């Protein structure tokens, strides 16, 4: 039989297999044809008619229609990108060169013309007085040749890796952000994803609820549809709607607070989950409110965290499921936290949960918010986008224009 397979990224391909074969045999065939890196057997989940196919069951038991398709979900292994070993190797190599040069005998010979001839095992021996072993004069003479060229050799060693470290650091940081946000869909791709998941046999309301609970992660949404949404987050949203505008400024302070809690991350990782320290951060509580109301702001938040604290973004990328679970937890009421002094700068108030929440803004910030509101967007969304984009008016305008407000 010819099985049509489709990924959540709209990639379609076909596999010819005997219907008497098991589901695991189909997974192995997918891995052999599409590559072990992209489709590992251990990370594959095959879904047909809203059910996950069991590895030990024969394909014919599921009565797969060749006109329909089987959904392939792939859980990618965590990519560990740590440039630290490279720097330690560099420091070790630098240490060995300095040690070898320091242990070299202080024999003043004429400098060798080519510094690249240092590793030559048979140098020109000018006065090799004690030739006890053929291996010992070679390091000594090599060290003598390294002596005059010590500075020129160390200079590229010191400069070249630093430039590559900076570029690799930037690329690894961008890779972390891409890894953390690659599974998120927004805008038109969101609507396409809703239609795609509905074709698996689910109602639109179910699909939208699952996507909202998974913060627009299609892989997680399908799991929620199959296994059930943990904690029934939809009912939480009805019973306890989070305040809208009380969480604008904390968007930027979340990453700042995370930067100050890097030491906490390392200490808690030994005793518990690496992300558990976020529960005690009031900034995370506020960030959870704004993300639960508007999940599409999550990519902007992750991008900001990636700039200010790449280590935290790496932890989030490696523990996405736990991070989303923490975001889905009900928001605790912050009693009397939103008050404060009302100094000369303006304030913006919005009703949320039966009480007023105030954000202190400068006159310039208030003017920027008013200009964004003049574009036709609701005040609550304008405030969220403005602070989520670090008070960058142009970025906030572009962000608002890309959103699909009909869904909200």
From Swiss-Prot:
Q: Does the keyword Manganese apply?
A: no
> Phosphothreonine (modified residue): where?
155, 164, 186
Enumerate the spans annotated as Ubiquitin-like domain.
1-79
Ranges in a coiled coil: none
Q: Name one GO cellular component term.
A: XPC complex
UBA domain: which residues?
A: 188-228, 363-403
Name the SUPFAM superfamilies for this protein.
UBA-like (SSF46934), Ubiquitin-like (SSF54236), XPC-binding domain (SSF101238)
User: Record's family?
Assistant: Belongs to the RAD23 family.
PANTHER family assigned to the protein according to its UniProt record, in alphabetical order: UV EXCISION REPAIR PROTEIN RAD23, UV EXCISION REPAIR PROTEIN RAD23 HOMOLOG B
This protein's domain notes: The ubiquitin-like domain mediates interaction with MJD.
Q: What is this protein identified as?
A: UV excision repair protein RAD23 homolog B
Protein species of origin: Bos taurus
């Amino acid at each position: 039989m010819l099985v049509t397979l489709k990924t959540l990224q709209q990639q379609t391909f076909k596999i010819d297999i005997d219907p008497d074969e098991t589901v695991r045999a189909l997974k192995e065939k997918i891995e052999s044809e599409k590559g072990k890196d992209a489709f590992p057997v251990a990370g594959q989940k095959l879904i047909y008619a809203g059910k996950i196919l069991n590895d030990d069951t024969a394909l014919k038991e599921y009565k797969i229609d060749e006109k329909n398709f089987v959904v392939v979900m792939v859980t990618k292994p965590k990519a560990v990108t740590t440039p630290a070993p490279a720097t330690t190797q560099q420091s070790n190599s630098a240490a060995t060169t300095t040690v070898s040069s320091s242990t070299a005998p202080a024999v003043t010979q004429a400098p060798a013309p080519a510094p690249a001839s240092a590793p030559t095992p048979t140098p020109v021996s000018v006065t090799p007085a004690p030739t006890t072993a053929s291996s010992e004069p070679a390091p000594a003479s090599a060290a003598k040749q390294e002596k005059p060229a010590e500075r020129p050799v160390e200079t590229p060693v010191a400069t070249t890796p630093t430039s590559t470290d900076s570029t690799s650091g930037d690329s690894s940081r961008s890779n972390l952000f891409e890894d953390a946000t690659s599974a998120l869909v927004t805008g038109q791709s969101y609507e396409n994803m809703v239609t795609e998941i509905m074709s698996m046999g689910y109602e639109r309301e179910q699909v939208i609820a699952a996507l909202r609970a998974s913060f627009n992660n299609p892989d997680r949404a399908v799991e929620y549809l199959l296994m059930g949404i943990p904690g029934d987050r939809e009912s939480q949203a009805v019973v306890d709607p989070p305040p809208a505008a009380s969480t604008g400024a904390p968007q930027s302070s979340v990453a700042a607070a995370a930067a100050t809690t890097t030491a906490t991350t390392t200490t808690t990782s030994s005793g518990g989950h690496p992300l558990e320290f976020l529960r005690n951060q009031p900034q995370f509580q506020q960030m959870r409110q704004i993300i639960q109301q508007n999940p599409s702001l999550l990519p902007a938040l992750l991008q900001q965290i990636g700039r200010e604290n790449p280590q935290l973004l790496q932890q989030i990328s490696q523990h996405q499921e736990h991070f989303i679970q923490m975001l889905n937890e009900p928001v605790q009421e912050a009693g009397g936290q939103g008050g404060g002094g009302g100094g000369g700068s303006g304030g913006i108030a919005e009703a949320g949960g039966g009480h007023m929440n105030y954000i202190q803004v400068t006159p310039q910030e208030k003017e920027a918010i008013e200009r964004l509101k003049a574009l036709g967007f609701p005040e609550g969304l304008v405030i969220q986008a403005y602070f989520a984009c670090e008070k960058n008016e142009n970025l906030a305008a572009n962000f608002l224009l890309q959103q699909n407000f009909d869904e909200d």
